[in-house]
Amino acid sequence: MNPSPLLDLIDSPQDLRRLDKKQLPRLAGELRTFLLESVGQTGGHFASNLGAVELTVALHYVYNTPEDKLVWDVGHQSYPHKILTGRKNQMHTMRQYGGLAGFPKRCESEYDAFGVGHSSTSIGAALGMAAADKQLGSDRRSVAIIGDGAMTAGQAFEALNCAGDMDVDLLVVLNDNEMSISPNVGALPKYLASNVVRDMHGLLSTVKAQTGKVLDKIPGAMEFAQKVEHKIKTLAEEAEHAKQSLSLFENFGFRYTGPVDGHNVENLVDVLEDLRGRKGPQLLHVITKKGNGYKLAENDPVKYHAVANLPKESAAQMPSEKEPKPAAKPTYTQVFGKWLCDRAAADSRLVAITPAMREGSGLVEFEQRFPDRYFDVGIAEQHAVTFAGGLACEGMKPVVAIYSTFLQRAYDQLVHDIALQNLPVLFAVDRAGIVGADGPTHAGLYDLSFLRCIPNMIVAAPSDENECRLLLSTCYQADAPAAVRYPRGTGTGVPVSDGMETVEIGKGIIRREGEKTAFIAFGSMVAPALAVAGKLNATVADMRFVKPIDEELIVRLARSHDRIVTLEENAEQGGAGSAVLEVLAKHGICKPVLLLGVADTVTGHGDPKKLLDDLGLSAEAVERRVRAWLSDRDAAN
């Protein structure tokens, strides 16, 4: 028997709109099953997609996509959207090398109105589209779909503030599941959770679930119950508005509707059809459950936010709750998490800050052991950095655990609030370099370039796990702002010290002595440099620091070797290799230099090893490039 007769009919939203509204609940069920199977094979963001199935169906059913624009915030919940927009048969390639991207991507489909991967951009982008349509005299509609976690970021409120004062037709759908990746923090989630109407919504949902089957058997009873439900909701809304005068969003100039059940697809269609005909800024508050329809994800949405894969034989039935085997080698994130706890036990001034990335940044144990010194500020990177600056002013020792790609969002604060005042804040910059399946929006390829130009900054790049701990300890003790950047995943497997040893700031070390060719390597590129150097009898320097850079070592290597190769997992432009060239120019040294890094291009997604090979940064690719360079130079001479 065909498990998805309705879904099989749909290759575009136009096919979806041919269905009767009463068929949509069945379609949503088929879509959820298909989602379980596809993510079960490829891995990816999981719980958030299960919670957005009915909402996605309703939006594409009501809005005339792709002419009408749906702008998904972050993009974690975009898989149902991709399935309904002609990519169903490619879902097995999701986040794989050469396959579908894990986030909306304009070059992938005309239905992906705005490329995304970071949080809280949807309202601003959709507002820009709505303003453009007004200028062009178009009656197209723009819709921003944003979660309550993403709504905590300042950029979302900046866009709300702007939109409420503009005469444009914009719908903001607030998908409220009380989660980002971790449970939400801050005043806004408390406001949403305490809403009287939300409480009434929960009560009505319970009553409907328990009485619906009985009412179905009584002629006319269901229709009467729906009228009563509508009246109760209306009274509750009126009571809430009387209590609060105007809701938060109405004070921003939006007409507020909701909250409504985000898993009742037929009712969602009715509500959206009404909203599509309204003028001006509108906000629809939708209540959903992250992981809906999948008990393990419902019960633990943090664990099932993203999964590597599900057992193939049981994906549709839900996998057994079996803990994965621990990696033989610790990840850099784990090395940081252990160092942080060890350091905090020895220094009561240490405080840790994360912008809503507790699990990913390795802070779970720290929060459990030192809850009073743990600050999750929500999806608010700008605030996280300035907040750290305030702590440092009063004698605390802040450690900001942040991904490289998200540190970009707080660049002004890094310069203005930290570096110009020379405040001793340590940035533990995770996910530096290629990250793999999440693609270019999450790659950490620019931090060396944008950090090393900032006055007072110390920038370190460890080559292995033990060096990571060494450099964290070293930079923590520095009386200046410092960043230690390290990659995703496991290291090289070297033993890791339990101590708090330090090294001299701004000094590198020689890892291998050779002749003629000197490899000047930074961070994760030390390992491939060593692998290649043995075949070419080259010298390898592990620089450790990008700023201050070891000028003495660079000059010595340049004068004792015929040529230099620099290696970094960062953009070539303005990166560590550029720093080496600056040193050579400063000292009037003219030697052939091959600069190996990430060229001026947007990287792809998929297996990191394949991506590094494409970029010419795997050990094999480095050897090919160096040999070709040497051959060209020999031929030229």
From Swiss-Prot:
- Pathway(s) the chain acts in: Metabolic intermediate biosynthesis; 1-deoxy-D-xylulose 5-phosphate biosynthesis; 1-deoxy-D-xylulose 5-phosphate from D-glyceraldehyde 3-phosphate and pyruvate: step 1/1
* Keyword annotations of the record: Isoprene biosynthesis, Magnesium, Metal-binding, Thiamine biosynthesis, Thiamine pyrophosphate, Transferase
The annotation note on the cofactor reads: Binds 1 Mg(2+) ion per subunit. Binds 1 thiamine pyrophosphate per subunit.
Q: Which GO terms describe its cellular component?
A: cytosol
> Mind telling me which Gene3D superfamilies this protein's record contains?
3.40.50.920, 3.40.50.970
What Pfam families does its record include?
Answer: DXP_synthase_N, Transket_pyr, Transketolase_C
What EC number is given for this enzyme?
Answer: 2.2.1.7
Q: Would you kindly state one Gene Ontology biological process term found in this protein's UniProt entry?
A: isopentenyl diphosphate biosynthetic process, methylerythritol 4-phosphate pathway
- Residues annotated as binding Mg(2+): D148, N177
Q: Which InterPro entries match?
A: Dxylulose-5-P_synthase, THDP-binding, Transketo_C/PFOR_II, Transketolase-like_Pyr-bd, Transketolase_BS, Transketolase_C, Transketolase_CS
Q: What catalytic reaction does the record list?
A: D-glyceraldehyde 3-phosphate + pyruvate + H(+) = 1-deoxy-D-xylulose 5-phosphate + CO2
Q: Please list the GO terms describing molecular function.
A: 1-deoxy-D-xylulose-5-phosphate synthase activity; magnesium ion binding; thiamine pyrophosphate binding
PROSITE patterns noted in UniProt: TRANSKETOLASE_1 (PS00801), TRANSKETOLASE_2 (PS00802)
Q: Which cofactor does it need?
A: Mg(2+); thiamine diphosphate
Q: Which residues bind thiamine diphosphate?
A: H76, G117, H118, S119, G149, A150, N177, Y294, E381
Q: SMART domains in the record, alphabetically?
A: Transket_pyr (SM00861)
Family classification: Belongs to the transketolase family. DXPS subfamily.
* Biological role stated in the UniProt entry: Catalyzes the acyloin condensation reaction between C atoms 2 and 3 of pyruvate and glyceraldehyde 3-phosphate to yield 1-deoxy-D-xylulose-5-phosphate (DXP).
Q: What binding partners and quaternary form does the record give? A: Homodimer.
Its protein name is 1-deoxy-D-xylulose-5-phosphate synthase
